[in-house]
Amino acid sequence: MPRGLELLIAQTILQGFDAQYGRFLEVTSGAQQRFEQADWHAVQQAMKSRIHLYDHHVGLVVEQLRCITDGKSTDADFLLRVKEHYTRLLPDYPRFEIAESFFNSVYCRLFDHRSLTPERLFIFSSQPERRFRTIPRPLAKDFFPDHGWEPLLMRILSDLPLRLPWQNKSRDIRYIIAHLTETLGEDALPRCHVQVANELFYRNKAAWLVGKLTTPDGTLPFLLPIHRTDEGELFVDTCLTTTAEASIVFGFARSYFMVYAPLPAALVEWLREILPGKTTAELYMAIGCQKHAKTESYREYLCYLAESDEKFIEAPGIRGMVMLVFTLPGFDRVFKIIKDKFAPQKEMSAAHVRACYQLVKEHDRVGRMADTQEFENFVLDKRQIDPALMALLRQEAPEKITDLGEHIVIRHLYIERRMVPLNIWLEQVEGQQLRDAIEEYGNAIRQLAAANIFPGDMLFKNFGVTRHGRVVFYDYDEICYMTEVNFRDIPPARYPEDELASEPWYSVSPGDVFPEEFRHWLCADPRIGPLFEEMHADLFRADYWRALQTRIKEGHVEDVYAYRRRQRFSVRYGAISSTANSS
């Protein structure tokens, strides 16, 4: 290769990333208009298209590089010089951290995920940690209650860029003050102030005002979800001021926010104070930088591995028929491999399973489906693998594994947040905790269905419980759209003997689902059955599911709340209006 080509290649990669992130910001900047126009289907489409942008631009850069190098192979020294030139371009670059991930992605695409070494890739960042600890330009604005909280909140709401009228701004301000007074106390409130992010965070049918509430005792989140009525009037639905509530809003089971972030590292650093339980990977994920979140997730994994002497073991729970799942005992994530052969009742291909995981990545997860990161050629040290797991890997997924002596390479896997399997949770809890878990499970099913997702296999083992007690679906191999399912009532038996027969007396076609049958496996436990019948009996009726299908086919997009219904101002302080409640 001619000298000087290394710099051209480095510049080409960085220019390719510039183009990708420019389009990312362009799609993101349309969020306000989509919200104001209530174009909810465009919201869903923008979410999908923004996810696709990254891989699309990686592909464009790879084609450019193949043209530049005329398809000739490159030696190791040449690649190291390319990385050195690229590193020199980053110190003054505002999105250096994601640019490093983009470089990694281009390299992996060019070399088919081979030779992934720290020398060739940005396994760890080349730049100082948290370079934007001091933010170069303000991301937020401070508001002080010099003349009381009512004018302070009036200024905050009036400063918003939204161009719709308010339904009743004074009422919403009263509700916010009432909440703050209940939470902080009347004496403390005058000594507090608020810092509000300059950009709104858009997701689903809400525009979130995200801020920090500084109190005499510390800093709290200050989150206001702003909705619009069918008539196009704005209202604040609630006020959230605890780290637990904020953690759920920014949770791993939710869709990515649309927030205009030309300096993503600075925004992540700013968010860190009100989301102390979130890792760097989770914060990048929340603002839509999911590919860099994957990089950060891998770094977190490597750091944990370096400080731990634990061995990889099979994950607790009932062994799956499609996926082999393992973990490190103290690590908060699991590793999932598609088996080479599935159980006989699972009539599907590995390609189908991967398509299901991609569907979840692109769809609105409504807080009920765990996000995943996909990896290829994942290397594990054999010394850190429990012998029982090693035997299981060789038995269930030998075609996915390459033995390199001291290491194995797993051709393809997913990393996902670790949760307590719901079936195990239900065995361990009693009383109110059991009731809450069953309520959560039913709510998860309803919210998934309203978002046009049918889980397929609804057994408790396919759901997990988060540290906040939320029930989340994580087994995607039978997932499909609600509109693809034929929900049927079981026909009456022709003769008494029909109900005792081993085969059904009625025809069953592909796509047929009989909700009455759910009762057999969801209500078998005498502790659970009565609770389920009390709270979720309608899930056993085909007409309930068909009614949801009708709403979906008519184009209705359901509201998705990242908090309990009882926290809504309309419930706490009186009805906003029938119109607002139906928005």
From Swiss-Prot:
Q: What is the effect of changing residue 20 to R?
A: In strain: S3333
Stated consequence of mutating residue 394 to Q: In strain: S2980, S2983, S3041 and S3044
| Known outcome of mutating residue 183 to I | In strain: S2980 and S2983
Any GO CC annotation of this UniProt entry:
cytoplasm
Residues of the active site are 371
Question: What outcome follows a substitution of residue 557 to I?
Answer: In strain: S2978, S2979 and S2993
Say if the entry is tagged with keyword Nucleotide-binding: yes
Q: What is the effect of changing residue 163 to C?
A: In strain: S3333
* GO molecular-function terms, A-Z: [isocitrate dehydrogenase (NADP+)] kinase activity; AMP binding; ATP binding; phosphoprotein phosphatase activity; protein serine/threonine kinase activity
Effect listed in the UniProt record for changing residue 183 to A: In strain: S3015 and S3027
Outcome of mutating residue 77 to N = In strain: S2980, S2983, S3013, S3014, S3015 and S3027
Annotated ATP binding lies at: 315-321, 336
Q: Outcome of residue 578 to T?
A: In strain: S3041 and S3044
Check the record and name the Pfam families matching this protein.
Answer: AceK_kinase (PF06315), AceK_regulatory (PF20423)
**Effect in UniProt of substituting residue 156 to M:** In strain: S3044
| Predominant cellular place of this UniProt entry's protein | cytoplasm
Show the catalytic activity.
L-seryl-[isocitrate dehydrogenase] + ATP = O-phospho-L-seryl-[isocitrate dehydrogenase] + ADP + H(+)
What is the similarity comment for this entry? Belongs to the AceK family.
What's the protein called, per UniProt?
Isocitrate dehydrogenase kinase/phosphatase
Which source organism does the UniProt entry give?
A: Salmonella typhimurium (strain LT2 / SGSC1412 / ATCC 700720)
